[in-house]
Amino acid sequence: MNTSTTTKSKNKPPKSTPSTFIKIIEFWFYLIQILTVLFSWRVYFLFIDSKKKIENNNNNDNDNNNTNKNDEKRYLTFKEKVQHNFFCLFTDTLYFMMLIITCTLFFWRLKDTLSLLKKSDSSKYKQIIWDQFSGGFVEFGSFTVLLLLKWPVIFKVFWNKGTEKEDKSTWSQIFMREFSQEVDKNKLGGPKPPTTNTTNFSGNGSSSSTTNATSSSSSQANNKRAMSDDEWRHAFRRDLQNIGFEFDSQTGDVSKFPPTEVMEQYQKSAEFRDLILASGSLKAGSEQQDKNKNNNNNNNNNGPKIEEYDNQKQEEEENEEKETNKQQTQKDDEKETSTTTTSSNKKSKKGKKNKRN
């Protein structure tokens, strides 16, 4: 019995214990952590009783017990507080650098940033700084790209400041508007050459060909002036997003409206006027295309009837000419008879006078 117990004890693996070297490293790292936190503004949080939720991974059948256990909170130990505040110092320094960059490089956002920081709670400081920093970075990048590639746009914006034509859009909105127009132009491409549609009709042994070059060229001219329905909607939605409208991704309805001043300014802008003119030309072009399509369909469906209609028209014209000729001859005959009667009456009167004399 004693031998079996001794063999079992020998076969058991020894417990893994950390080496002294690792313990020394952990001690010095903890010492650095506590010293940095003590000499930072985070020392205040070391003496606050902060709670932390306990993560419960046990699977119990009773749901009420699970919810109660998941909602339980415990106080952090002093060591956990030191570690938590030490790692929070890194994020604090990053956000502090973002704040300095926002206030110096993106100085036009300084007023909004400070006002938001004063009004908001301290728990929202990092989110506010990140939003202002990312927004300022986008604005600065858009301005730089426009300055390098499309400097006349920037000159126009500064030139119209303080006037009725002032563009109140942000630099990112102007950037999206300018470069999205170029993308749309590249997608549209150049105009297509006019095509001639010849249709042969076989009726009564004769054939006729009709060319639709003029109709196709006129419809292409209208298409060149106007944009398609989808392009017009895309341009209008893009302009609304640029001035501050927000749309729901699922339903497509408007979820946020801009201020009334911005909407009034947009209604007075040249872009809104161009869109309205484009919608008018779009309707005219679509109506012209529908008419041309209907004419082509009628010609294709009623080919043999065209010749019959032409023949009937010619017969009617010939009959009208015959009737007019008959009427003209009757009028001429009446004139001749009237002239002969008048001349005979004059002769009879002269004969009577001569007899009297």
UniProtKB/Swiss-Prot annotation:
The chain crosses the membrane at residues 21-41, 86-106, 135-155. Residues 195-223 have a biased composition (Low complexity). Residues 305-314, 322-337 have a biased composition (Basic and acidic residues). Residues 346-357 have a biased composition (Basic residues). GO terms for cellular component: endoplasmic reticulum; lipid droplet; membrane. It is a multi-pass membrane protein. It comes from the Eukaryota. It is found in: Membrane. Residues 184-229, 283-357 are annotated as: Disordered. Keywords: Coiled coil, Membrane, Transmembrane, Transmembrane helix. This is Putative uncharacterized transmembrane protein DDB_G0291600. It comes from Dictyostelium discoideum.
